[in-house]
């Protein structure tokens, strides 16, 4: 909310694979993840997060690592995850987007299965002086998969 509440503090803004308010895609995803977390099924949760975040090409290379990933980093409990998921479920800044005054770059993935590509388009349509870039064929993890992601962001910020 910094760019909304204090626009003079922000010269340029990048919003990547995000949304301003709930949509059916994120509601469905979050409800599934919340159920897995409540059940304590870390393995199924991590696999579902990966399957919904990465492109098919990426997943083909890394699916064989699922058994290892499901054992690494398992939390003692899911309270932190549940708190973050609840915050995502109640977040709504849509009506305030017109208060963002600085040049803004919205980046999304055309195949985003978590927040949807439409969420990126919606953001870009509501923010004036906004540039939209959708990575074709990539999803929510576009920031990890696109080789030019960091350079694109840096070029915009410079």
What do the predicted segments below correspond to?
Residues 113-119:
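Conserved alpha/beta-hydrolase "acid-adjacent" motif
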Residues 24-26, 44-96:
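Conserved alpha/beta-hydrolase catalytic His-Asp/Glu region
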Residues 121-122, 151:
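Active-site phosphate/pyrophosphate- and oxyanion-stabilizing loops and adjacent acidic/basic residues
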Residues 1-5, 9-39:
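Flexible "cap/lid" loop of the alpha/beta hydrolase fold
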């Amino acid at each position: 909310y910094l760019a909304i509440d204090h626009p003079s503090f922000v010269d340029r803004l990048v919003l990547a694979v995000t949304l301003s308010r709930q949509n059916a895609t994120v509601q469905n995803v979050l409800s599934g993840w919340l159920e897995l977390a409540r059940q304590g099924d870390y393995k199924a949760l991590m696999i579902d997060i990966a399957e919904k975040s990465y492109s098919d090409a990426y997943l083909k290379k890394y699916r064989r690592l699922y058994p290892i990933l499901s054992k690494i980093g398992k939390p003692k409990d899911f309270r932190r995850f549940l708190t973050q998921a609840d915050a995502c479920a109640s977040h709504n800044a849509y009506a305030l987007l017109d208060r963002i005054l600085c040049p803004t770059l919205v980046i999304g993935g055309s195949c985003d299965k978590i927040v949807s590509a439409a969420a990126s388009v919606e953001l870009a349509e509501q923010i004036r002086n906004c540039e939209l870039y959708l990575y074709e064929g990539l999803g929510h993890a576009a920031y990890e998969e696109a080789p030019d992601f960091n350079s694109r962001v840096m070029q915009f910020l410079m």
